[in-house]
Amino acid sequence: MGLELPLVLGTSSVFRREQMERLGIAFQAASPDFDETPMLGESAPQTALRLAEGKARSLTGRFPGALIVGADQVAWCDGRQWGKPMNLANAQKMLMHLSGREIEFYSAVVLLNTVTGRMHRHIDKTVVVMRQLDELHILRYLEREPDAVYCSCAAKSEGLGALLIERIESTDPNALIGLPVFRLVDFLKNEGVDVL
């Protein structure tokens, strides 16, 4: 494949690691050390891109001479940003609120070449329309898909979360999982990495 610089995925997300593994190229995952608190007045796409860039930049000291991938996703609905519920009670409340609503997911990916300083950036917008949900269906879903509490809006689309979704509009179906793979492949090619 001719990969000269090591490839590092800056994430603690098991879902993003799985997405990278499916590409079949050698990489190392490393947890970034970066404050992910949204800034006041920041739009969802701005937050996603700032966090993706920050994650990549936070790893430059540990991985000089590398290609570093940073990614983040921010959901937007009802005039505010939504994150990961992180526990069952929050997931139940979140899914009840989002029932029947349209959610915009902004998935940002960056590729930083630490040798040249060049950074490739992209934000992918995915629109998800949730089905009308009741408490019983939400409880059953969360019992069968416990990892959903670690997903944005508790909607694990690559698993049983697909049952909660009425419609998805996207140019890259991978972006909703957390990593816009189509654009990442382009970025890697631009840096001399052929994934095939």
Swiss-Prot record:
Cofactor dependency: a divalent metal cation
Entry EC number(s): 3.6.1.-
Subcellular location: Cytoplasm
InterPro entries: ITPase-like_fam, Maf-like
Keyword Glycoprotein part of the UniProt annotation: no
Catalytic reaction(s) noted: N(7)-methyl-GTP + H2O = N(7)-methyl-GMP + diphosphate + H(+)
Species the sequence originates in: Neisseria gonorrhoeae (strain ATCC 700825 / FA 1090)
A Gene Ontology biological process term: nucleotide metabolic process
Function: Nucleoside triphosphate pyrophosphatase that hydrolyzes 7-methyl-GTP (m(7)GTP). May have a dual role in cell division arrest and in preventing the incorporation of modified nucleotides into cellular nucleic acids.
Active site, renumbered: D72 (proton acceptor)
Pfam families: Maf
Protein name: 7-methyl-GTP pyrophosphatase
Xref: NCBIfam families: maf (TIGR00172)
PANTHER family cross-referenced by the UniProt entry: BIFUNCTIONAL DTTP/UTP PYROPHOSPHATASE/METHYLTRANSFERASE PROTEIN-RELATED, BIFUNCTIONAL DTTP_UTP PYROPHOSPHATASE_METHYLTRANSFERASE PROTEIN-RELATED
GO cellular component: cytoplasm
Main location: cytoplasm
Site feature (Important for substrate specificity) residues: F15, Q73, E158
Gene Ontology MF, one: nucleoside triphosphate diphosphatase activity
Broad enzyme group: hydrolase
Keywords, sorted A to Z: Cytoplasm, Hydrolase, Nucleotide metabolism
Family per similarity comment: Belongs to the Maf family. YceF subfamily.
